[in-house]
A protein has these predicted regions:
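ATP-dependent adenylation/nucleotidyltransferase module used to activate substrates
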Residues: 1-144
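Intrinsic disorder and flexible/low-complexity segments
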Residues: 216-227
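Catalytic subdomain that performs nucleotidyl-dependent activation
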Residues: 73, 110-114, 118, 132-205
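Short alpha-helical "packing" element that flanks the helix-turn-helix/winged-helix DNA-binding module
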Residues: 206-215
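Generic alpha-helical structural context detector
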Residues: 89, 93, 148, 170-173, ...
Length: 227
């Protein structure tokens, strides 16, 4: 992949889309992962003066918060930290006072509430500034629907939407994203110990091979079809 050409194309594309919408810049939520890191750096290249990153902790790990700070300081990306833990706990208390659920279903409902709270916060910030909300979901995730409806999928633009996970990693190396972010296990941070690949039941390498080359072991193909 010609990373220089891809970066130039995505930066130009983002500027054009924001201009077409009559907006002034972009707001992006950063998670401490490689996808949001790459998207944030591209956004800053497109809008050096009109790019705002939001760090939105909601039962987030200390590691993710450290990695966010490492990225944002390295690339001088303006950011704000908005703690969502109290709002999240209040909603959980209110909702579960009349809906009694146990086990994995309750865990999933609680987990999906987090990106939906972040979506609401991102749009408040974007509307206040006349900006668009920039997403961080890659092509691999979009292909199998690995996102939260009206959560991390609730954005105006998906700058990584045509890039496989392996291509995002290639861009991350080209852009000199901190290696600790590139090499960390992909996770949505939905609950302690959660990982993307464990939840999907396949690796990103297997998924990308299927998308790019239409190949894979029968069990992998069946798993992808059922996602």
């Amino acid at each position: 992949m010609n990373c220089e050409a891809v970066v130039q194309h995505l930066v130009t594309w983002l500027r054009e889309k924001v201009e077409e919408a009559g907006a002034r810049g972009v707001v992006i939520g950063v998670s401490g992962g490689v996808d949001s890191a790459v998207a944030a750096v591209l956004a800053q290249k497109a809008f050096p003066e009109n790019c705002m990153a939001l760090v939105l902790p909601c039962e987030s790990s200390t590691e993710d918060l450290i990695h966010n700070r490492l990225l944002l300081d390295k690339f001088n990306i303006p950011y704000r930290v908005i703690e969502l833990d109290n709002v999240y706990q209040l909603l959980i208390t209110q909702l579960e006072s009349y809906i009694k659920l146990d086990g994995s279903k309750r865990r999933l409902l609680r987990a999906n509430l987090k990106p939906r709270l972040r979506m609401t916060t991102l749009y408040y910030s974007a509307q206040a500034r006349g900006y668009l909300v920039l997403g961080t979901t890659n092509k691999s995730e979009i292909t199998v629907g690995y996102s939260t409806k009206h959560g991390d999928s609730g954005v105006d633009l998906q700058i990584l939407g045509d890039l496989l996970k392996r291509e995002v990693l290639e861009l991350a190396n080209y852009l000199h994203i901190p290696s600790v972010i590139i090499n960390k296990t992909p996770s949505g941070g939905l609950w302690a110990g959660q990982t993307d690949e464990e939840e999907m039941g396949i690796s990103y390498e297997q998924l990308d091979d299927y998308i790019e080359y239409n190949r894979g072991e029968p069990g992998v193909i069946e798993r992808i079809a059922n996602l």
